[in-house]
């Protein structure tokens, strides 16, 4: 699992994340290997209610270990892609692989940028009102760095202009 990702553009809806190579031997992690094989992936928004479980399945287990079982998270079938999504997630994006870009020299510490097109959005009805996600109900967390995460409960709005005044 990855606690960080970024939107790229909206036409088509595109998203990216950056898996690193394993720290002790530089090999590609299972997430990347699975994406290479299936050409598909799912991104789930992590709410604080299952943040600890998300971190628990980030351990680099051998590929024969099921992180769903070790973390006690629950997979559910996706609608359009093979990889499952999380039943705990109130927002999930089913994605088709667009491209993988390798960054660095292929050793530990280097990594990849994975770019995918979102082909299906899942948004729980309980957190969606008038065309907007209610952040207080989603209660998302984000990774800052290392073992540090943040909550989205102290935010403010800054209105930006789409184009300059005439």
Outline where the language-model segments fall.
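Basic, polyanion-binding surface patches
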Residues: 1-166
């Amino acid at each position: 699992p990855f606690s960080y990702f970024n939107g790229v553009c909206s036409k088509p809806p595109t998203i990216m994340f950056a898996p690193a190579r394993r720290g002790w031997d530089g090999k590609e992690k299972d997430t990347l290997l699975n994406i290479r094989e299936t050409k598909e992936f799912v991104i789930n928004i992590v709410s604080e209610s299952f943040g600890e479980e998300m971190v628990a399945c980030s351990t680099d287990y051998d590929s024969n270990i099921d992180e769903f079982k070790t973390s006690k998270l629950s997979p559910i079938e996706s609608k359009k892609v093979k990889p499952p999504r999380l039943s705990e997630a109130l927002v999930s994006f089913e994605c088709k692989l667009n491209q993988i870009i390798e960054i660095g020299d292929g050793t530990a510490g280097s990594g990849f940028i994975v770019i995918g097109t979102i082909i299906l959005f899942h948004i729980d009805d309980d957190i969606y009102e008038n065309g907007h996600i209610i952040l207080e109900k989603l209660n998302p967390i984000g990774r800052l760095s290392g073992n540090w995460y943040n909550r989205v409960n102290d935010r403010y709005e800054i209105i930006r202009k789409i184009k300059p005044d005439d």
